[in-house]
Amino acid sequence: MTEKKPMIQALQAVRGMNDILPDEAEAWEHFEDIVRDWLRSYGYRPIRMPIVEPTPLFKRAIGEVTDIVEKEMYSFEDALNGEQLTLRPEGTASCVRAAIQHKMLSAGAQRLYYHGPMFRHERPQKGRYRQFHQIGVEALGFDGPDIDAEHILMCARLWDDFGLEDVRLELNSLGSSDERARHRAELVAYLERHRERLDDDGRRRLHTNPLRILDTKNPELQDLVDNAPKLLDFLGEDSLKHFNGVQVLLKDAGVPYRINHRLVRGLDYYNRTVFEWVTTRLGAQGTVCAGGRYDGLVEQLGGRPAPAAGFAMGIERLLALWRESGGEAEPAQPDVYVVHLGEQAQRLAFRAAEALRSHGFAVLMHCGGGSFKSQMKKADASGAPVAVVIGDDEAATGEVGLKPLRGPGGQQRVALDGLANAVAECLFTENEEEDGSL
């Protein structure tokens, strides 16, 4: 009796890190194509950074006493040299590090963008993943309110391009480090007077990162933080002028916004303008896009002092919002499906397929054998409007059969050197019929 082999256990993806299967991946590519065109229309250029960075980069940039650094980073020791490494939790620090390392600012101010996976060790839930994807935009070397306004207007245009509704802009200014220090002292004194009302998280942050208490989601603390000292009241002349300059440009462009005194962002490197685009259409996790200025970060990471601003948006959330608003990507379909039967027919089929691809057609070549009937079923299912059919008779004469699959008309014989023109004519005729031109 043959001994039964034990079942090999199938492995699964890590929880919170999702496979993006072909139907979904096509929607992502359609979305990313639109985004790339949008970014280029504003003069932004692509940059690609490593997924793994030295851990001190994020500790220095994001801040030691932040949720990201304290709780959420995937960090490990390099077994070869003992270096502490981290899967990037965000892109700004990496982009600034690259700009410093390669002396990019010596050539002048830079408008840059990137997109790709980021990693945070969070509890997976709707709209939150351990591996998620971001589009990041960074403008290095620009110090005026105009670049802040440009970033916000860029987002407004993208929402319009995608037909997104119910996305609202919230705005605040964090001022300079000196202004934040004065506000911090008043804020800590205020919170100390109400220490008994703070939750465990608030008491922990009281003397390490009190600004983050203003961003609490605890409903029992809402009236406490609503009455806390407002950073806007501590801004000096320069910070107020900068913030007013942003608002003037937004009003000129007709972009509505709400000043949110509790908007502080979760990363330590921000100063002056900060903003978020939020929606109620994605449940509790309603931030679609966020950004602001980080004028001290270049120097903080070892570069010469340089102003900077940027923003990032989550691709998963944007796609969900786009679909919620009725957005849909058309599935990719070939122009031509090639059917063949017999060895000589197969050889001619490969030549025909490559000839069509040389003329820019998308061609799906049947592989795996089967009868003409079964192959034609697959041709119909592929969505291709035209089939190239090759059997022994066609192979013997060096010709191919051309059969419309969607419109009227029967199969015709075409010489190989005239195939591209014949396919183009078939596709043109079909498009005219779909448009109602005939």
From Swiss-Prot:
Compartments, as annotated in UniProt: Cytoplasm
A GO CC term attached to the entry: cytoplasm
Source domain of life: Bacteria
GO terms for biological process, alphabetical: histidyl-tRNA aminoacylation
InterPro entries named in the record: aa-tRNA-synth_II, aa-tRNA-synth_II/BPL/LPL, Anticodon-bd, Anticodon-bd_dom_sf, His-tRNA-ligase, HisRS-like_core, HisRS/HisZ, HisRS_anticodon
E.C. designation(s): 6.1.1.21
Keywords, comma-separated and alphabetical: Aminoacyl-tRNA synthetase, ATP-binding, Cytoplasm, Ligase, Nucleotide-binding, Protein biosynthesis
Reactions mediated catalytically: tRNA(His) + L-histidine + ATP = L-histidyl-tRNA(His) + AMP + diphosphate + H(+)
GO MF entry, a single one: ATP binding
UniProt record similarity statement: Belongs to the class-II aminoacyl-tRNA synthetase family.
Subunit structure: Homodimer.
Record PANTHER family: HISTIDINE--TRNA LIGASE, MITOCHONDRIAL-RELATED (PTHR43707:SF1), HISTIDYL-TRNA SYNTHETASE (PTHR43707)
Full protein name: Histidine--tRNA ligase
